């Protein structure tokens, strides 16, 4: 009986405690929340750090290249999520390629809006005005980039520049594309005004040059040539960017911060932010332990000019029996040339090459990159060299190259394209194009006789 009374007393006490907790409405102190967050510089820094979660920026198979003529995948027109729905025209809004892009972009827009709406708390708490301006600029940058992407893919959009509930967002409908474009330019301008030219050793956050370059890309896509040319030129005139001497090295995981990377999201093996294992496995050739199933297309191979500057169907230098000879060097920096070493083996997809040299052991072994030996070797005989080296094998499956969103080569070529569209072709345009071409051949831009 006494025990029963004790239990009843405990239960009653717990009930009173629960009722008391409910009425007190205590704000949690162990996690960020909209009721108390954005009040200190530390909280603002943590908030903007979340803008650069890789999932907000990358695309399936690391980019939308799978949706172009540049790649092929052996299940491309069969498996959902492999890009086939784009290529065969069966894509709908319910497919992952579509709704994940829409969902992730609006998530980041919502984060940016929430910071901009609540940063007044930090201002009222006396946080350094220079820091406030910088944090705002990062939010404007994120919002501009994501609306720019959504406009490119979808046109008219629901436009939100403040926090909304889902029901409120559903009720506003779509805003015409033409009305949103100027708002995106305004956001980019706010970012340009508030971001630093450099973060010093820190490279995970966007700079003034990144905002200029992303504005130029958006303007180019929208056909606003004057805006694109000016934004690209402004980035060039900062004089903080340059091209790496070796094109192929730019994309390796061993290459860290370099002046060619205008905007990139860093990965880190130590922090478990790595390339998707699917991509690593399918990018490596079969002799190196991969599948060799996500490949460059023959369309891409054919796109590279010959060393005389002519396309393969016009150049007398092109030999269809030796398709890699006399080609722009970026061709073999991107696609593995037959008969050359790649990740420890001589790569030869020929049906006649049933044995291949293992360059690490010096011994001949069964050639799993020939379909005469392995049924599922590369279906078109091509595999990627770009970005892939021995470290992919040594660290498998943990590979962590930066996710590059904007390079200085992009800026130079965007400037040239915009000026050409304006019919304003001058020495600055030729210099921009020649700088990129010359780098491919490993010479100076002024040595025009050494490259086409």
What are these language model-derived features?
Residues 18-20:
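C-terminal motif of bacterial Sec signal peptides marking the signal peptidase cleavage site
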Residues 22-81, 157, 189-192, 205-365:
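An aromatic- and glycine-enriched ligand-binding surface/loop that stacks and positions planar moieties
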Residues 41-57, 79-154, 169-182, 188-203, ...:
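Conserved, well-structured interaction surfaces
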Residues 181, 225, 425-426:
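TPR-repeat structural position
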Residues 329-436:
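C-terminal substrate/ligand-recognition segments
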